[in-house]
Amino acid sequence: MANLKSIKKRIVSVKNTRQITKAMKMVSAAKLRRAQENVVAARPYAGKLAEVLERLAKTQESDASPLMVKRDTRRALLVVVTSDRGLCGGFNANLSKAAERFINERKGEFSELSLMTIGRKGYEFLRNRHTVRKHHGNIFSTLSYQTAALIAAELVEGYLAEDYDEVYVIYNAFKSVMTQDITLEQLLPVTPKAGDDDEVGTEYIYEPSKAALLDELLPKHIEVQVFKSLLESVASEHGARMTAMDSASKNATEMIGKLTLIYNRARQAAITTELMEIISGSESIKG
Protein backbone atom coordinates (compact mmCIF):
# COMPACT_ATOMS: atom_id res chain seq x y z
CA MET A 1 0.00 0.00 0.00
CA ALA A 2 2.87 2.34 0.80
CA ASN A 3 4.23 1.80 -2.73
CA LEU A 4 0.80 2.50 -4.25
CA LYS A 5 0.52 5.75 -2.31
CA SER A 6 3.94 6.94 -3.44
CA ILE A 7 3.12 6.17 -7.10
CA LYS A 8 -0.22 7.95 -6.85
CA LYS A 9 1.46 10.93 -5.20
CA ARG A 10 3.96 11.10 -8.04
CA ILE A 11 1.18 10.96 -10.65
CA VAL A 12 -0.54 13.92 -8.96
CA SER A 13 2.76 15.81 -8.87
CA VAL A 14 3.44 15.25 -12.58
CA LYS A 15 -0.13 16.31 -13.45
CA ASN A 16 0.37 19.55 -11.51
CA THR A 17 3.63 20.16 -13.37
CA ARG A 18 1.86 19.55 -16.69
CA GLN A 19 -0.74 22.17 -15.81
CA ILE A 20 2.05 24.68 -15.20
CA THR A 21 3.91 23.88 -18.44
CA LYS A 22 0.69 24.09 -20.47
CA ALA A 23 -0.12 27.47 -18.93
CA MET A 24 3.41 28.73 -19.65
CA LYS A 25 3.11 27.54 -23.25
CA MET A 26 -0.14 29.48 -23.69
CA VAL A 27 1.35 32.63 -22.15
CA SER A 28 4.44 32.37 -24.38
CA ALA A 29 2.24 31.85 -27.45
CA ALA A 30 0.33 35.06 -26.70
CA LYS A 31 3.54 37.02 -26.07
CA LEU A 32 5.14 35.54 -29.19
CA ARG A 33 2.39 36.92 -31.43
CA ARG A 34 3.02 40.44 -30.16
CA ALA A 35 6.80 40.01 -30.37
CA GLN A 36 6.54 38.75 -33.96
CA GLU A 37 4.49 41.80 -34.93
CA ASN A 38 7.18 44.07 -33.47
CA VAL A 39 9.97 42.28 -35.33
CA VAL A 40 8.07 42.33 -38.64
CA ALA A 41 7.47 46.07 -38.20
CA ALA A 42 11.11 46.84 -37.31
CA ARG A 43 12.85 44.91 -40.09
CA PRO A 44 11.73 47.05 -43.08
CA TYR A 45 12.61 50.29 -41.28
CA ALA A 46 16.07 49.01 -40.37
CA GLY A 47 16.58 47.75 -43.92
CA LYS A 48 15.55 51.03 -45.55
CA LEU A 49 17.76 53.04 -43.20
CA ALA A 50 20.73 50.81 -44.08
CA GLU A 51 19.91 51.30 -47.77
CA VAL A 52 20.02 55.10 -47.43
CA LEU A 53 23.37 54.85 -45.63
CA GLU A 54 24.72 52.67 -48.44
CA ARG A 55 23.85 55.33 -51.01
CA LEU A 56 25.40 58.06 -48.91
CA ALA A 57 28.54 56.00 -48.26
CA LYS A 58 29.22 55.62 -51.99
CA THR A 59 29.78 59.35 -52.38
CA GLN A 60 31.49 60.05 -49.06
CA GLU A 61 34.96 59.38 -47.72
CA SER A 62 35.31 56.60 -45.14
CA ASP A 63 36.22 59.20 -42.52
CA ALA A 64 33.22 61.44 -43.28
CA SER A 65 31.91 60.71 -39.79
CA PRO A 66 33.76 59.68 -36.61
CA LEU A 67 31.41 56.67 -36.40
CA MET A 68 32.74 55.39 -39.75
CA VAL A 69 36.44 55.81 -39.01
CA LYS A 70 38.32 52.51 -38.86
CA ARG A 71 40.98 52.80 -36.19
CA ASP A 72 43.82 50.44 -35.39
CA THR A 73 41.92 47.81 -33.46
CA ARG A 74 43.23 47.50 -29.93
CA ARG A 75 40.11 47.20 -27.80
CA ALA A 76 36.77 45.61 -28.67
CA LEU A 77 33.39 45.37 -26.98
CA LEU A 78 30.96 42.48 -27.44
CA VAL A 79 27.29 43.10 -26.59
CA VAL A 80 25.70 39.80 -25.52
CA VAL A 81 21.89 39.68 -25.63
CA THR A 82 20.19 36.92 -23.64
CA SER A 83 17.01 36.75 -21.53
CA ASP A 84 16.32 37.47 -17.87
CA ARG A 85 14.33 34.26 -17.39
CA GLY A 86 15.00 30.60 -18.02
CA LEU A 87 12.82 27.61 -18.97
CA CYS A 88 13.42 28.24 -22.67
CA GLY A 89 15.53 25.24 -23.66
CA GLY A 90 19.05 25.96 -24.88
CA PHE A 91 18.22 29.56 -25.83
CA ASN A 92 20.56 31.21 -23.31
CA ALA A 93 23.18 28.49 -22.95
CA ASN A 94 23.78 28.19 -26.70
CA LEU A 95 24.17 31.95 -27.15
CA SER A 96 26.45 32.33 -24.12
CA LYS A 97 28.65 29.52 -25.43
CA ALA A 98 28.73 31.15 -28.89
CA ALA A 99 29.82 34.41 -27.27
CA GLU A 100 32.57 32.57 -25.42
CA ARG A 101 33.73 30.94 -28.66
CA PHE A 102 33.95 34.37 -30.29
CA ILE A 103 36.01 35.65 -27.35
CA ASN A 104 38.39 32.68 -27.42
CA GLU A 105 38.81 32.81 -31.21
CA ARG A 106 39.29 36.58 -31.50
CA LYS A 107 40.98 37.58 -28.24
CA GLY A 108 44.39 37.33 -29.89
CA GLU A 109 43.43 40.19 -32.24
CA PHE A 110 42.74 42.65 -29.41
CA SER A 111 44.70 43.93 -26.46
CA GLU A 112 41.38 44.01 -24.59
CA LEU A 113 38.02 42.38 -25.29
CA SER A 114 35.30 43.32 -22.80
CA LEU A 115 31.58 42.63 -22.63
CA MET A 116 28.28 44.40 -22.22
CA THR A 117 25.58 41.94 -21.20
CA ILE A 118 21.87 42.50 -21.74
CA GLY A 119 19.80 39.92 -19.87
CA ARG A 120 20.49 38.21 -16.56
CA LYS A 121 21.25 34.73 -17.91
CA GLY A 122 24.18 35.81 -20.07
CA TYR A 123 25.55 37.95 -17.26
CA GLU A 124 25.45 35.05 -14.80
CA PHE A 125 27.23 32.77 -17.28
CA LEU A 126 29.97 35.20 -18.33
CA ARG A 127 30.67 37.42 -15.32
CA ASN A 128 33.14 35.03 -13.67
CA ARG A 129 34.83 34.11 -16.95
CA HIS A 130 35.40 37.46 -18.65
CA THR A 131 35.42 41.22 -18.07
CA VAL A 132 31.86 42.57 -18.06
CA ARG A 133 32.10 46.34 -18.57
CA LYS A 134 28.35 47.00 -18.21
CA HIS A 135 25.21 44.98 -17.50
CA HIS A 136 21.61 45.82 -18.38
CA GLY A 137 18.97 43.68 -16.66
CA ASN A 138 15.19 43.62 -16.34
CA ILE A 139 14.59 45.65 -19.50
CA PHE A 140 12.55 43.15 -21.51
CA SER A 141 9.31 43.34 -19.52
CA THR A 142 9.00 47.04 -20.45
CA LEU A 143 11.16 47.11 -23.57
CA SER A 144 10.88 50.35 -25.55
CA TYR A 145 12.77 52.19 -28.26
CA GLN A 146 13.92 54.69 -25.62
CA THR A 147 15.69 51.88 -23.74
CA ALA A 148 17.50 50.81 -26.91
CA ALA A 149 18.40 54.43 -27.65
CA LEU A 150 20.01 54.81 -24.22
CA ILE A 151 22.07 51.65 -24.74
CA ALA A 152 23.08 52.83 -28.23
CA ALA A 153 24.09 56.22 -26.79
CA GLU A 154 26.38 54.43 -24.30
CA LEU A 155 28.01 52.50 -27.15
CA VAL A 156 28.50 55.60 -29.30
CA GLU A 157 29.87 57.61 -26.38
CA GLY A 158 32.39 54.88 -25.52
CA TYR A 159 33.43 54.53 -29.15
CA LEU A 160 33.97 58.27 -29.62
CA ALA A 161 35.93 58.38 -26.36
CA GLU A 162 38.08 55.53 -27.78
CA ASP A 163 37.23 53.22 -24.88
CA TYR A 164 36.97 50.58 -27.60
CA ASP A 165 37.70 50.53 -31.33
CA GLU A 166 35.13 47.98 -32.49
CA VAL A 167 31.68 47.01 -31.19
CA TYR A 168 29.91 43.74 -31.97
CA VAL A 169 26.51 42.43 -30.93
CA ILE A 170 25.51 38.76 -30.67
CA TYR A 171 21.88 37.73 -30.31
CA ASN A 172 19.27 35.15 -31.33
CA ALA A 173 17.56 36.21 -34.56
CA PHE A 174 13.98 34.99 -34.88
CA LYS A 175 13.32 32.68 -37.83
CA SER A 176 10.36 30.61 -36.63
CA VAL A 177 8.88 29.17 -33.45
CA MET A 178 11.24 26.22 -33.79
CA THR A 179 14.29 28.06 -35.13
CA GLN A 180 16.44 30.84 -33.70
CA ASP A 181 19.70 31.72 -35.45
CA ILE A 182 22.63 32.99 -33.39
CA THR A 183 23.68 36.17 -35.20
CA LEU A 184 26.87 38.22 -34.85
CA GLU A 185 26.95 41.76 -36.27
CA GLN A 186 29.41 44.64 -36.17
CA LEU A 187 27.84 47.84 -34.85
CA LEU A 188 30.86 50.16 -34.82
CA PRO A 189 32.54 51.46 -36.82
CA VAL A 190 29.58 51.67 -39.19
CA THR A 191 30.56 50.04 -42.48
CA PRO A 192 27.63 50.22 -44.92
CA LYS A 193 27.63 47.45 -47.48
CA ALA A 194 28.53 48.47 -50.99
CA GLY A 195 25.40 48.64 -53.14
CA ASP A 196 24.88 47.48 -56.71
CA ASP A 197 27.26 48.97 -59.25
CA ASP A 198 24.26 49.88 -61.44
CA GLU A 199 23.23 52.51 -58.90
CA VAL A 200 26.57 54.34 -58.87
CA GLY A 201 25.59 56.63 -61.73
CA THR A 202 22.31 57.63 -60.11
CA GLU A 203 22.36 61.13 -58.65
CA TYR A 204 20.34 61.90 -55.52
CA ILE A 205 19.65 65.29 -54.00
CA TYR A 206 20.17 65.32 -50.23
CA GLU A 207 18.82 68.06 -48.01
CA PRO A 208 20.23 69.87 -46.13
CA SER A 209 23.51 68.12 -47.08
CA LYS A 210 25.14 64.68 -47.18
CA ALA A 211 27.32 65.45 -44.17
CA ALA A 212 24.35 66.67 -42.12
CA LEU A 213 22.37 63.57 -43.04
CA LEU A 214 25.23 61.29 -42.01
CA ASP A 215 25.56 63.04 -38.66
CA GLU A 216 21.84 62.52 -38.08
CA LEU A 217 21.39 59.03 -39.53
CA LEU A 218 24.44 57.21 -38.17
CA PRO A 219 23.46 57.48 -34.46
CA LYS A 220 19.88 56.63 -35.49
CA HIS A 221 21.20 53.60 -37.36
CA ILE A 222 22.95 52.34 -34.20
CA GLU A 223 19.75 52.86 -32.18
CA VAL A 224 17.68 50.94 -34.72
CA GLN A 225 20.16 48.06 -34.92
CA VAL A 226 20.25 47.73 -31.12
CA PHE A 227 16.44 47.89 -30.91
CA LYS A 228 16.03 45.32 -33.68
CA SER A 229 18.45 42.91 -32.00
CA LEU A 230 16.50 43.23 -28.73
CA LEU A 231 13.17 42.65 -30.50
CA GLU A 232 14.59 39.63 -32.35
CA SER A 233 15.86 38.22 -29.06
CA VAL A 234 12.49 38.69 -27.33
CA ALA A 235 10.62 36.91 -30.13
CA SER A 236 13.21 34.12 -30.16
CA GLU A 237 12.93 33.73 -26.38
CA HIS A 238 9.15 33.31 -26.48
CA GLY A 239 9.42 30.89 -29.39
CA ALA A 240 12.04 28.83 -27.56
CA ARG A 241 10.02 28.84 -24.33
CA MET A 242 6.85 27.85 -26.15
CA THR A 243 8.66 24.94 -27.79
CA ALA A 244 10.31 23.88 -24.52
CA MET A 245 7.03 23.99 -22.58
CA ASP A 246 5.24 22.04 -25.32
CA SER A 247 7.94 19.37 -25.15
CA ALA A 248 7.75 19.33 -21.34
CA SER A 249 3.95 18.92 -21.46
CA LYS A 250 4.23 16.00 -23.88
CA ASN A 251 6.90 14.36 -21.71
CA ALA A 252 4.69 14.82 -18.64
CA THR A 253 1.74 13.20 -20.43
CA GLU A 254 3.94 10.27 -21.42
CA MET A 255 5.23 9.91 -17.86
CA ILE A 256 1.69 10.03 -16.45
CA GLY A 257 0.73 7.18 -18.78
CA LYS A 258 3.69 5.05 -17.66
CA LEU A 259 3.11 5.78 -13.97
CA THR A 260 -0.60 5.00 -14.32
CA LEU A 261 0.26 1.65 -15.90
CA ILE A 262 2.70 0.89 -13.06
CA TYR A 263 0.09 1.96 -10.51
CA ASN A 264 -2.61 -0.28 -12.03
CA ARG A 265 -0.26 -3.27 -12.15
CA ALA A 266 0.82 -2.72 -8.54
CA ARG A 267 -2.81 -2.33 -7.47
CA GLN A 268 -3.78 -5.50 -9.31
CA ALA A 269 -0.90 -7.38 -7.67
CA ALA A 270 -1.95 -6.10 -4.24
CA ILE A 271 -5.56 -7.21 -4.80
CA THR A 272 -4.39 -10.63 -6.02
CA THR A 273 -2.18 -11.01 -2.93
CA GLU A 274 -5.09 -10.11 -0.63
CA LEU A 275 -7.37 -12.62 -2.37
CA MET A 276 -4.76 -15.35 -2.05
CA GLU A 277 -4.41 -14.60 1.66
CA ILE A 278 -8.19 -14.77 2.13
CA ILE A 279 -8.40 -18.07 0.25
CA SER A 280 -5.49 -19.51 2.23
CA GLY A 281 -7.11 -18.44 5.50
CA SER A 282 -10.42 -19.96 4.47
CA GLU A 283 -8.77 -23.25 3.53
CA SER A 284 -6.91 -23.42 6.84
CA ILE A 285 -10.17 -22.91 8.76
CA LYS A 286 -11.85 -25.69 6.82
CA GLY A 287 -8.92 -27.98 7.41
Curated annotation (Swiss-Prot):
GO terms for cellular component: plasma membrane; proton-transporting ATP synthase complex. GO terms for molecular function: ATP binding; proton-transporting ATP synthase activity, rotational mechanism. It is found in: Cell inner membrane. It is a peripheral membrane protein. Gene3D superfamilies: 3.40.1380.10, ATP synthase, gamma subunit, helix hairpin domain. Keywords: ATP synthesis, Cell inner membrane, Cell membrane, CF(1), Hydrogen ion transport, Ion transport, Membrane, Transport. The keyword Protein biosynthesis does not apply. InterPro entries: ATP_synth_F1_ATPase_gsu (IPR035968), ATP_synth_F1_gsu (IPR000131). Belongs to the ATPase gamma chain family. F-type ATPases have 2 components, CF(1) - the catalytic core - and CF(0) - the membrane proton channel. CF(1) has five subunits: alpha(3), beta(3), gamma(1), delta(1), epsilon(1). CF(0) has three main subunits: a, b and c. Produces ATP from ADP in the presence of a proton gradient across the membrane. The gamma chain is believed to be important in regulating ATPase activity and the flow of protons through the CF(0) complex. This is ATP synthase gamma chain. It comes from Geobacter sp. (strain M21).
